[in-house]
Structure formats: structure tokens, C-alpha cells
């Protein structure tokens, strides 16, 4: 736990409110863009946002009135019990939801959810959750408030800790305490909710029969209220909150989860098990029973390092339920947290600033939801996503050092098991129960799986389809079935579909799944995989530069030195030095720190050959000067061990647990919750074997006895390197507590004479999870097992730096050569071509096929300068990424110079890439089928309406689809405080010798699924990817400037063409794409070409080529016509290749610059680097004569 304790003052209040709004006072169009609602239900979820669903002055964290305690002689008085909590990030519309537009036009989603629920054996919400319930309808509430039921929307805003208590009818409406607040255009009435325990002093538990007015715990003289039960609200909470949690916890009795969570909300001292003992489990053959694993080795083989579990799966089932119980306790810890972040104010969103009228705001909102669809889709398309972790596996007992079985952190793990959910169920002893469900070997993705991961909630499923409808069909990953042809071709066929009719088939959920079927995950045998998580960056601080946290502040500061200011020490860090370099480059007009990924500003600086060469000289000089000074300060002033620091450097970032940062809509909040549950259970499962070891686990009382032990072991993991928490001391606002008077009932005004006592004065607040990635691959094989050593040897080959000739366009200056080719080499174009072509020009140059008389003196001088710069950079380069802008070149160049100072050799370093989501208008008729709102009467009518939609996209704010771009300036992307998706694997280990504390590390890993997840993913072990959807500048302000099998995809073919080079690479790429994609190529634009090539300039060339071919064709565009046009263009450009040149070819290999621009990089080790001059024999690292005090501490080993 952190040593620093913070004090926070919070107000007191009810556990929730029912808001009553007139329809005309709400911005329903904007609300509908953020809501979750299906077409067949009036129930809906909305995000908790100020000036949208709650008032601007809404207080999100408070001390909730959760009960009463007797005080005084003979218990004559009462004191209110107060429990800290924050409001749940989603609100529940249970009346008037029909006024909110459905998230998706897909019909009968409730039917789909019910069918999937029955297939997988989860319980339904049938009737009231308690006996004797009396319903309070929405119409009754409206009538009591004097509002028209048909023109009123009612929704519940509830604290996170007590939402299950609302479902269990343990609350009542306090009509006497209603007040009026202002939201958007009008006044809104809100009714507070309080727990019925307020009328039952000293009852610190869930009341199983709240409608029993003769309950013996009711205080004498108290006027007991009518508990609040509403059928629609209970169904909404059950399906959209509790059932998704039950799926994640593998508990099919959903009401048992609700009962356990509600009990923990009232009883803060409960530590035992809360889930019932009769929980059922999915039957499947565990790999630890001696069967073949996914890796092909038998668990009971004599050469295996693990043994089969002797309990026949009993310990696996026990670990599953105990981890689920621990996760429920962890949810209570989170729900009682006090967070400073407040719900976002929609009126303060930067993307709405300066917009007039409704349509521009809706267009901006529609565009941003398409961006969000990129990260939502990644969680759906990745098979190792936290959404699919529905089962627990036992990898078998590991061998301890003495040869016997010992406790292991890695024995139990979660794995993706939706394909097993329909298997029969077993009890705790493994006996198969009678069940209608049967297992199936068909692992094809279906709508049932989507319903499963959504907890069978139709509103959540509709919202998930809302985002999937904005994802493309994966046209670049092979198997390019056309959804339009599928719908039109089957329109008159009798296809059995339980969800749609002919006229609604284009918008059916099955059609959406069919369109995306190539991207949907496939599940197989249980294997340990990284966890695909969804989270939010709530801080602009991250160590995502090429060398991560090299030379950090905590290491550079001198312990006990009170004379130096912290800011002075901070200026000597690697992070601050790189920032100063960017400032220097900005002053030279080479970089715009507000848009560091763009090189457009260089157009005003580079106007001819001399300015281009001057830019190279300035860039090199600035970087080398900054790096030399930085290393000098580290060694001379800071006494920093530069080589040891490099081996310890890590990339790092933190994903916040703050409940409102990821609450853009109900689905993003849902994904945050699923991520939390997956991470918590991963940690809890790691401690299960340690709890089981040496115990008689088969005992009936074992779980109740050792559940508190597992919970304490889990809590001990906090602040151990992965989950960060902070202790907060809570104080109450001055004044008495306002609450209903128990002697007057629920209609009387609130009494203001109560005192309140906090259940816990000190609260542990979960802040964030830390993700790290080691910068340098060490290749050290000592103290490792044989299996680990073999894996490390395989990794070493991937990290081995290869010495090869550098292609100029793929080197350090490739992006500049492409951007300014037309300016520098206007005649550098193929014969019979009208536009300069850098691929053709540099290919001929490097093949020594360019006639010398076609080059001017200025061009030759520039070519020599480019060649020298590129070769010098390549000689010291250990980063397996070509720069794509000045910012990337500067940070890579500086990182390589630091590596050179540290004598780094042999291995490439780990690098980071941020895939940034974007938005574009759809161009393919297949991608707009789900937006067809008119009934279709024929197959031809479908295509006609789809094309009509494409013609008026500007007036339809919902017509946006997602797009992707990439950048290696990851810190700049993290400054946007984005929503992110990435893979993490959590390692657990003991501390130093004699330290029994368990530490963890959230290792940055990958998302399985390859290009199905994102078209810009590439298989490279040295790279780490993160998909980001920026929030800064859109919905929050910004301050300051795969799996192991690599698939053969169209993107891989295109990248292969680019790597192989060629004079007319554009024509080869275009022909390949047309052959693979077919008629879809007609609608391809710049974003599509960029997704394929990951090269902005080549993508623009391909876009121009595409437009040229369309203009050339005399008939409408066809595949055959396009390929014929490509063939004609190729013949024209190669017509002169067979001619004998009249003069000698320009010799590129012997090209050298006419002037010497000696690099001032110093080689600390004295070793030579190809392309750099050997330093003089008497050259020293730094002149140390002026520092006599430090001279004795610097050794030759350090130098």
C-alpha cells in the first residue's frame, strides 16, 4: 500500500435517484447515438453524463445512507450507517424508452438472447426476485408526480455498490425527498432511493423478504415503506449488469450472483464465501488429465515438466468458484472507492466547440462513434479477448526443485471457451447433471456467442451490433464474400432464420455476423494466452518513447540531497531530453509538436535541393549534439550507470480504474468491467494452488474455511507491480445527514436531525493497472528450464540484427524521398508517364540503370547526401522500423546513438506502434445494408436502396465506418488520453531471497487474430501494438502541445511486393489487389490503400493510379477492364527498357557527397561502426579534468 494517505471530504446522500424527464426536454437524437436499446424492447441504457442525463452540479462520489444503528440507552435512538461509493456509469431507462432510437435495426434480439440463454443453461429473470413483490409501474410514478406517462422518460441513476440491492427490491422511493434539477432544456424531477434497512436498525445484511411488513427487525413505531419493484427495471439490471458478471464468473445461477453482491454491499465485514455451494460447472475434458494439449505434448509424459491433476478436475472446479468469489469481493472494493474524476459534461466536449445546428453535431458524434468501433471491434475479433474468457483450465502440478509437486502461480488459468458453453453441466464432484444442452464440435462463430458475451442482454447486444455494423468486412484478409450478393441471392430462398423475415434480412444480426465472418474468432483447445484488455489512459504521462523510462527521475535524483530542485533533476532525464530535442526541431521549423506525426509543414521549408540537404545537416547536428550532451551529463554529473540502466529500461503505461473515463457509452463501460473481472480472476487463480497445497481440498468445509485466505492473498497483491491502490481517509461534509424519518414513512419530508457514522473511515481505492515492456532483449539463458531456454533461443533468432543492403525508400529518409520526389527529381518518371514516380526512380538508381545524363549536378549531390545519411543511420540502427515522419526519425536516431554509447550490439530492441482509429464515409454497398430502413420487396430493391444511401451520406450522420492509421510516436498518441486495446500477460514471482511477498508484472503482449483484428497488424516479435481511440480533442480536453501462426493475407502480399521493390511497384500492387478483392476495388480510396501499404505516399500514388484507370476506361469499371488498363500502362512504361543507352549509367554504389560532413558522434567503447570514421587514438569520451571530485569515481569499465 502507498505510504501517502489522502483525506477526501464527501457529502452524504441516497443510494440512487429516479429521474423523471419530459421527452421534449431531452436531446433524443444525441442520446440515441450513445444509448443501448434494441428494437423489440422499450428498455434502454444511457451513459451517465452531465447535461445529458444528470445535472451539471451532479456529485458522483458520496457517503451513501446504507442502514441504521441503535444508539443510546436501551437503543432509544438511531444513527445512520454510511458507506462510501460512486454512481454507476450507466443509467437504466425503465419507462418511456420507446422515445430513444434503437441502436441497431436488427429485429428480435430479445428472442436471440433468450434462445442463447436456454442453450447455454443460464437462468432467466422470471418474475420478481423476492416473494410477495408488489410492482410499482412507471405510469404510477408519473401519475404521482403529475406527469403524462406517454410523454415522460423515467430512468434510474444508482450507486455502483447498491445496484444489485435495487434488483433484490431492498430499496424504496422516498417521495417526500424529491427535488427539481435542471438538465439541458428543462427542469427534471428526481426521487431519492434509500434502503429498507433504514427501517431495520442493526440489520447489516440483505433482506430476503423486503415486502414482509411484519418483519421482526422493523423498528418499533416505524412506518415501513413499500419497497420498489419494477419488472422492466429488474429485467434491465439482471440482463445488462448481473448476467454479464455471471458469465465472466462462470456462474449460471444469475440470481445467486445478485444475492451475493447485494449481501456484500450491506455487510462490509463478510469474508467468507457468498456464492452458493450448488454451483454447476461446464463439462469438458481437461488437458491436465493426461490428454494431448494444444502444444502436442502429453501432460503425463515422462519428459513433461508437469503432472496430471490427481483430483480428476475437482481442484479446477474449486479454483474456478473460489476465484469467482474473490472477484465479487474485489468488485466491492472497487465499488466503495472514491474517485476524483467526475462524469463528463457533454456541453464541454471539444469536438462540439463552434458547431451550430443539429446536423453538424450529429455528424461529429457519428464520426467519433466510428472511431470507437475500431477498439470495440478489436475486442470482438480477437480470440484472446477478455470477453471470451469463460472457462478455467488446470495445467497440472509442476515439479518443485526437489522433484516433488510444489505450489505454482501458473497452474490455473482462464481460457476462451464459448464453444464449450453448450456442454452438459456437472456438480462440484464432476457428476454430469441431466441437461438438455449438448456439446457441439462446430466452433463457427454465431449470434449466440455475441449474446453470451453480452450476458444475454438485448440492449447490450444491440449496442454491440451498432459498433460491428461500422466495422469493415476484412476485405484484405482473404475469403471475400460479398454480403450484398448473399442477401440478394438468398432473398427468394427459404433460409431458416429465427430472427428476421425477407424484408428485414439486410438488417438481421445473422447478416452482420455473416458479413464479418472472416474476422470473427475461432476457438480451439485450451492454451494459456495473453489477455486482450480494454482500458483508458486518464493521464498524459507514459513512458512510450523508444527507450522507455531510460535514465528516470527516481534513479537520477540523489538520495538525501535537499539542495537541488526536482525540476532540475527532471531536465536531465531521457524523457525531458527528447522533449527538448523536439522543441529545438520545432524552432528549426522541422516539426510541429501539436501534430508530430505530420510532415506537411516541411513543404514551406524544403523548396529546392540546397534546403533539402540543409535540413539533413541540421537534423543530424541537432540530434547528435543533444545526445552527446545528454550522455555527458549522465556520466559526469549524475554518475548514472548507462549500460546497466539500458538493460533495466522498460516501456510503461497505466490504464485507469476510474469509472467515468471509459464510460462513453454502455458498451465501453461493459468492456471495462469485463477487463477488470478477467484481470482480478487471473490474479486470484494464481494464488489458488498456493492455498490448496498440502490441504484436504475435498472437505465439505474447505471452501468456507479457506475463501478468506484466498481473499487476503489477493489483497496482498495490491501495489506489487501491477494493480496500484491508494489509501484514502474519508471525512463527511459538515452538518446533519438528510434521510427519511422512519417514524413518518416514505411520503414525509426528509428529517435533518440524524447523525451518521462511516462504516469504514479508511478506504482502499484501486487506481490503475500498470503495463510494461522491456526495451532490450537480453538473450540470457541462465537459470532457465530447458523449455524456457528453447523458447528463448527461438526468440533470439527473431531479434538477431541482419546485415543487409538498405533500400533508400525503406531507410531513414524514405518518407522524405517520397514526399518531395516531385520537387527534387521532377524528371524522375517512367517513359510515357506524366507524374514523377519515386519507386521507379530509386529502383533504377540502386540497380545502376539510371542514365547519368538524366541527372543534374544538384540532383547527384542530393543523391549522395541521401545515400550517406541513410547508410550511416543503418550502420548504427537497432530499431526494426523505418521512420515515417521527422518526429519518428529524430527519436529513432537519438535512441540509436544512445545504444551506440552503451555498446549495444547484436539484438534489435523492442519497439512500440500505436494503431489509431479513424472514421470515413462508406463506399461499398455491402457496408450500408444495416442502414436500410425501408422495407424491401425484391432482391433488386436491396441494391437500389444501398446505392441510394451512398449517394446521400453527407446528410446521414450515422453513415460512418472505422479506419486505421499507425504511428511510432506512441507517447504522442498516449497524450490524447485514448481508449486502448492491447494484450497483456501477468507474470507472478516472489521477491528477493527471504521475501515471501508475491510481485507481478503486466507484460505488454499481443492480440491474437492477426489482420482479422486490425489490417495494420504485422507478425514481428520485436514489435508491440496497441490500438488507440483518442479522447483528447474529442470528448475531453488535452493540455500541452497474435497467434503464432502467420496467415497469408492480401496485406502480406502487398508488403512483399513493396519489399521486393521494382520500378513500377504501384502497378503490381494495383493488379494484385484487383485480382484478390474483385469488384470491391472500384470503391477503394486513400484509407483502403493506406491500410494495405501502411505508406501514406504510396497510398496517394495508388489513389491517383486508381483515378487514372477509371478515367481511362471507356466503359463502366470492371475487374477485366482494370487489369487490361494496368497491362497497357505497364507496357508503356517499360517500352524503353530494352533500348541501349547512348551513355554510361549513373553508378549509385560509388556515389559520395562532394563535401565532408563529419559526424560528431563519439564511440565510447572505441569500436568502429560501418559508415562512421574511426575516432583518433587519443580520443576520450569527455574531458574530465575540470571535475576532480568525481574523477576518482569514474572507472574505465564505466567508460
Swiss-Prot record:
InterPro entries: DBP_sf, Viral_ssDBP_head, Viral_ssDNA-bd
Localization in the cell: Host nucleus
Pfam families listed in its UniProt record: Viral_DNA_bp
Motif (Required for filament formation): 841-842, 1146-1148
Sorted UniProt keywords: DNA replication, DNA-binding, Host nucleus, Metal-binding, Zinc, Zinc-finger
GO biological process: DNA replication
Disordered: annotated span: 289-314
Region (Required for nuclear localization): 1172-1199
Gene3D superfamilies per the UniProt record, alphabetical: 1.10.150.560, Viral ssDNA binding protein, head domain (1.20.190.40)
GO cellular component: nuclear viral factory
Zinc fingers classed as unnamed: ranges: 497-510
Biological function: Plays several crucial roles in viral infection. Participates in the opening of the viral DNA origin to initiate replication by interacting with the origin-binding protein. May disrupt loops, hairpins and other secondary structures present on ssDNA to reduce and eliminate pausing of viral DNA polymerase at specific sites during elongation. Promotes viral DNA recombination by performing strand-transfer, characterized by the ability to transfer a DNA strand from a linear duplex to a complementary single-stranded DNA circle. Can also catalyze the renaturation of complementary single strands.
Subunit (UniProt): Homooligomers. Forms double-helical filaments necessary for the formation of replication compartments within the host nucleus. Interacts with the origin-binding protein. Interacts with the helicase primase complex; this interaction stimulates primer synthesis activity of the helicase-primase complex. Interacts with the DNA polymerase. Interacts with the alkaline exonuclease; this interaction increases its nuclease processivity.
Recorded family membership: Belongs to the herpesviridae major DNA-binding protein family.
Protein name: Major DNA-binding protein
Provenance organism: Varicella-zoster virus (strain Oka vaccine) (HHV-3)
Amino acid at each position: 500500500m502507498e505510504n501517502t494517505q489522502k483525506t477526501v471530504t464527501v457529502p452524504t446522500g441516497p443510494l440512487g435517484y429516479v429521474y423523471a424527464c419530459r421527452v421534449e426536454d431531452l436531446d433524443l437524437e444525441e442520446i440515441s447515438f450513445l444509448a443501448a436499446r434494441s428494437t423489440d424492447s422499450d428498455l434502454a441504457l444511457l451513459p451517465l453524463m452531465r447535461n445529458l442525463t444528470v445535472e451539471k452540479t451532479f456529485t458522483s462520489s458520496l457517503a451513501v445512507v446504507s442502514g441504521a444503528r441503535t444508539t443510546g440507552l436501551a437503543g432509544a435512538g438511531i444513527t445512520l450507517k454510511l458507506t462510501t461509493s460512486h454512481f454507476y456509469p450507466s443509467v437504466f431507462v425503465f419507462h418511456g424508452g420507446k422515445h430513444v432510437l434503437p441502436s441497431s435495426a436488427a429485429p428480435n434480439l430479445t428472442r436471440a438472447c433468450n434462445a442463447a440463454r436456454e442453450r447455454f443453461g443460464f437462468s432467466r429473470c422470471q418474475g420478481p426476485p423476492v416473494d410477495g413483490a408488489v410492482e410499482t409501474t412507471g405510469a404510477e410514478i408519473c401519475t404521482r408526480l403529475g406527469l403524462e406517462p406517454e410523454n415522460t422518460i423515467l430512468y434510474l441513476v444508482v450507486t455502483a455498490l447498491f445496484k444489485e440491492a435495487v434488483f433484490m427490491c431492498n430499496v424504496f422511493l422516498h417521495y417526500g425527498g424529491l427535488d427539481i434539477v435542471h438538465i439541458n432544456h428543462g427542469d427534471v424531477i428526481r426521487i431519492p432511493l434509500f434502503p429498507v434497512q433504514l427501517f431495520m436498525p442493526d440489520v447489516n445484511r440483505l433482506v430476503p423478504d423486503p415486502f414482509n411488513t411484519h418483519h421482526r427487525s422493523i423498528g418499533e413505531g416505524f412506518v415501513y415503506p413499500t419497497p420498489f419493484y419494477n419488472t422492466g427495471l429488474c429485467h434491465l439490471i439482471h440482463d445488462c449488469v448481473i448476467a454479464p458478471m455471471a458469465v465472466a464468473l462462470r456462474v449460471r445461477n444469475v440470481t445467486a450472483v445478485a444475492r451475493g453482491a447485494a449481501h456484500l454491499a450491506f455487510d462490509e465485514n463478510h469474508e467468507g464465501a457468498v456464492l452458493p455451494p450448488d454451483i454447476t460447472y461446464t463439462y469438458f475434458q481437461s488437458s491436465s488429465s493426461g490428454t494431448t494439449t494444444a502444444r502436442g505434448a502429453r501432460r503425463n509424459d515422462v519428459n513433461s515438466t508437469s503432472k496430471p491433476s490427481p483430483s480428476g478436475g475437482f481442484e479446477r472446479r474449486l479454483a474456478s468458484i473460489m476465484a469467482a468469489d474473490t472477484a465479487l469481493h474485489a468488485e466491492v472494493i472497487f465499488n466503495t472507492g472514491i474517485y476524483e474524476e467526475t462524469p463528463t459534461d457533454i456541453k464541454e466536449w471539444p469536438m462540439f466547440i463552434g458547431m451550430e445546428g443539429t446536423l453538424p453535431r450529429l455528424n461529429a458524434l457519428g464520426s467519433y462513434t466510428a472511431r470507437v468501433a475500431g477498439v470495440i471491434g478489436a475486442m470482438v475479433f480477437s480470440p484472446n479477448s477478455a470477453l471470451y474468457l469463460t472457462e478455467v483450465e488446470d495445467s497440472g502440478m509442476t515439479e518443485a526443485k526437489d522433484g516433488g509437486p510444489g505450489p505454482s502461480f501458473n497452474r490455473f488459468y482462464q481460457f476462451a471457451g464459448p464453444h464449450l458453453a453448450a456442454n452438459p453441466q456437472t456438480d462440484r464432484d464432476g457428476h454430469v447433471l441431466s441437461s438438455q444442452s449438448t456439446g457441439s464440435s462446430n466452433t463457427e462463430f454465431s449470434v449466440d456467442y455475441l449474446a453470451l458475451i453480452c450476458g444475454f442482454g438485448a440492449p447490450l447486444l444491440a449496442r454491440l451490433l451498432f459498433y460491428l455494423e461500422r466495422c469493415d468486412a476484412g476485405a484484405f484478409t482473404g475469403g471475400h464474400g460479398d454480403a450484398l450478393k448473399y442477401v440478394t441471392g438468398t432473398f427468394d430462398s427459404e433460409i431458416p432464420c429465427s430472427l428476421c423475415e425477407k424484408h428485414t434480412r439486410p438488417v438481421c444480426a445473422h447478416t452482420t455476423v455473416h458479413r464479418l465472418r472472416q474476422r470473427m474468432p475461432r476457438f480451439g483447445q485450451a492454451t494459456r494466452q495473453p489477455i486482450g484488455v480494454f482500458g483508458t489512459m486518464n493521464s498524459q504521462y507514459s513512458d512510450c518513447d523508444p527507450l522507455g523510462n531510460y535514465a528516470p527521475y527516481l534513479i537520477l535524483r540523489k538520495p538525501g540531497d535537499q539542495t537541488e530542485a526536482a525540476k532540475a533533476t527532471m531536465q536531465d532525464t531521457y524523457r525531458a531530453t527528447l522533449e527538448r530535442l523536439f522543441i529545438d526541431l520545432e524552432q528549426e521549423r522541422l516539426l510541429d509538436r501539436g501534430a508530430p506525426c505530420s510532415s506537411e509543414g516541411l513543404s514551406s521549408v524544403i523548396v529546392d535541393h540546397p534546403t533539402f540537404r540543409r535540413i539533413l545537416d541540421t537534423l543530424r547536428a541537432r540530434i547528435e549534439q543533444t545526445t552527446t550532451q545528454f550522455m555527458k551529463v549522465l556520466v559526469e554529473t549524475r554518475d548514472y550507470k548507462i549500460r546497466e540502466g539500458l538493460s533495466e529500461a522498460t516501456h510503461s503505461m497505466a490504464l485507469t480504474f476510474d469509472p467515468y473515463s471509459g464510460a462513453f457509452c454502455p458498451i465501453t463501460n461493459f468492456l471495462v468491467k469485463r477487463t477488470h473481472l478477467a484481470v482480478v480472476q487471473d490474479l486470484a487463480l494464481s494464488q489458488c494452488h498456493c492455498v490448496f497445497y498440502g490441504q484436504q481440498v475435498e472437505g465439505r468445509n474447505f471452501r468456507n474455511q479457506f475463501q478468506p485466505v484466498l481473499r487476503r492473498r489477493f489483497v496482498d497483491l495490491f501495489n506489487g507491480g501491477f494493480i496500484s491502490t491508494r489509501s484514502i481517509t474519508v471525512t463527511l461534509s459538515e452538518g446533519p445527514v438528510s434521510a427519511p424519518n422512519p417514524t413518518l414513512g416514505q411520503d414525509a419530508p426528509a428529517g435533518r436531525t440524524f447523525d451518521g457514522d462511516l462504516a469504514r473511515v479508511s478506504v482502499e481505492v484501486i487506481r490503475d493497472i500498470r503495463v510494461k515492456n522491456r526495451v532490450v532483449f537480453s538473450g540470457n539463458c541462465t537459470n532457465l528450464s530447458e523449455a524456457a531456454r528453447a523458447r528463448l533461443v527461438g526468440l533470439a533468432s527473431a531479434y538477431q540484427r541482419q546485415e543487409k543492403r538498405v533500400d533508400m525508400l525503406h531507410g531513414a529518409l524514405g518518407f522524405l524521398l517520397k514526399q518531395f520526389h516531385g520537387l527534387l527529381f521532377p524528371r524522375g518518371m517512367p517513359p510515357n508517364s506524366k507524374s514523377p514516380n519515386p519507386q521507379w526512380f530509386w529502383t533504377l538508381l540502386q540497380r545502376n540503370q539510371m542514365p547519368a545524363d538524366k541527372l543534374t549536378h544538384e540532383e547527384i549531390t542530393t543523391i549522395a547526401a541521401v545515400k550517406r545519411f541513410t547508410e550511416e543511420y543503418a550502420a548504427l540502427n537497432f530499431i526494426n522500423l523505418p521512420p515515417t515522419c521527422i518526429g519518428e526519425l529524430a527519436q529513432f536516431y537519438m535512441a540509436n546513438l544512445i545504444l551506440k554509447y552503451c555498446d549495444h550490439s547484436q539484438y534489435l530492441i523492442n519497439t512500440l506502434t500505436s494503431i489509431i482509429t479513424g472514421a470515413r464515409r462508406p463506399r461499398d454497398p455491402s457496408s450500408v445494408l444495416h442502414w436500410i430502413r425501408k422495407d424491401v420487396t425484391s432482391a433488386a430493391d436491396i441494391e437500389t436502396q444501398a446505392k441510394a444511401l451512398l449517394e446521400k451520406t453527407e446528410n446521414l450522420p450515422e453513415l460512418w465506418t472505422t479506419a486505421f492509421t499507425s504511428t511510432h510516436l506512441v507517447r504522442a498518441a498516449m497524450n490524447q488520453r485514448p481508449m486502448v486495446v492491447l494484450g497483456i500477460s501477468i507474470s507472478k514471482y516472489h521477491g528477493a531471497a527471504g521475501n515471501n511477498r508475491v510481485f507481478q508484472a503486466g507484460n505488454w503482449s499481443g492480440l491474437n487474430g492477426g489482420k482479422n483484428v486490425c489490417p495494420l497488424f504485422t507478425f514481428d516479435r520485436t514489435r508491440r501494438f496497441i490500438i488507440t481511440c483518442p479522447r483528447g480533442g474529442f470528448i475531453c480536453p488535452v493540455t500541452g502541445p497474435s497467434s503464432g501462426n502467420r496467415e497469408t493475407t492480401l496485406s502480406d502480399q502487398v508488403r512483399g511486393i513493396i519489399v521486393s521493390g521494382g520500378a513500377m511497384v504501384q502497378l503490381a500492387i494495383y493488379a494484385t489487389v484487383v485480382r484478390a478483392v474483385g469488384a470491391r476495388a472500384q470503391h477503394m480510396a486513400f484509407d483502403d490503400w493506406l491500410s494495405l501499404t501502411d505508406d501514406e505516399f504510396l497510398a496517394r500514388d495508388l489513389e491517383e493510379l486508381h483515378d487514372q484507370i477509371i478515367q481511362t476506361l471507356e466503359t463502366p469499371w470492371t475487374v477485366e477492364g482494370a487489369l487490361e488498363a494496368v497491362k497497357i500502362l505497364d507496357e508503356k512504361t517499360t517500352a524503353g527498357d530494352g533500348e541501349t543507352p547512348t551513355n554510361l549509367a549513373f553508378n549509385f554504389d560509388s556515389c559520395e557527397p562532394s563535401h565532408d560532413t563529419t559526424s560528431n558522434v563519439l564511440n565510447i567503447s572505441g569500436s568502429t561502426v560501418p559508415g562512421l570514421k574511426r575516432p583518433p587514438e587519443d580520443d576520450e569520451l569527455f574531458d574530465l579534468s575540470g571535475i576532480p571530485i568525481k574523477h576518482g569515481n569514474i572507472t574505465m569499465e564505466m567508460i
